[in-house]
């Protein structure tokens, strides 16, 4: 949801679309959902704090997008510096909650999230839609890596909270993860093609090609 709705917001904002507001609201709700997801493990205060940090992450991203649209390099650089500081704050907070989340590892994960998202924004803004497709794949593949690292850390720290009789082989786990990714790709690229096609956008053809690749 985080990566998908960030992409939707980028597209709608760069198009100055009436859908920008609803996309922003849904993206901000995702930060509440992420905070709520950790409350059963780390408590209400921790969940609320994570939501606040992630909300700032999104609002800074909005500032970066606005600066790119305005071609204001000074404002963009300042916002990107704030984005990095916010990533450091998120890493510090998470590392303090779980020893299986080393701060340096989290920083690397978050910095890659920022860089791949920026590449997506730049490709979209410059209307390099082939690069835009590749950038989105990089964003999405990395967000899965980050999500796995976070969930693995929780499972290692609190195995008692997640009891389960079934023990799956690595091949079974890989199959399940692969199928989820493929069907998520299918849904996301169908939606993106619908948006591009209805807007008569030059991005429709690259989106269609990526959607057809998913079927292969």
Please identify what each model-predicted range represents.
Residues 28-65, 216:
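Mid-chain, structured segments of secreted extracytoplasmic proteins
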Residues 1-13, 17-20, 24-27, 31, ...:
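C-terminal amphipathic alpha-helix
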């Amino acid at each position: 949801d985080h990566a998908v709705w960030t992409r939707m917001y980028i597209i709608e904002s760069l198009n100055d679309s009436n859908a920008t507001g609803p996309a922003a609201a849904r993206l901000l709700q995702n930060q509440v959902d992420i905070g709520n997801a950790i409350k059963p493990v780390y408590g209400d205060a921790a969940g609320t704090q994570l939501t606040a940090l992630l909300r700032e992450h999104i609002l800074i991203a909005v500032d970066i997008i606005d600066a790119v649209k305005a071609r204001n390099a000074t404002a963009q650089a300042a916002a990107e510096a704030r984005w990095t500081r916010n990533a450091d704050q998120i890493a510090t907070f998470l590392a303090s909650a779980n020893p299986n989340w080393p701060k340096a590892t989290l920083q690397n994960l978050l910095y890659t999230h920022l860089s791949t998202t920026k590449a997506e924004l730049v490709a979209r803004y410059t209307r390099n839609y082939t690069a835009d497709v590749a950038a989105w794949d990089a964003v999405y593949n990395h967000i899965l890596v980050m999500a796995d690292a976070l969930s693995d850390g929780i499972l290692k720290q609190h195995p008692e909270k997640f009891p389960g009789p079934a023990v799956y082989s690595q091949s079974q786990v890989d199959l399940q993860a692969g199928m989820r990714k493929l069907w998520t790709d299918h849904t996301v690229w169908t939606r993106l093609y619908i948006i591009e096609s209805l807007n008569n956008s030059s991005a429709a053809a690259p989106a269609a090609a990526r959607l057809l690749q998913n079927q292969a």
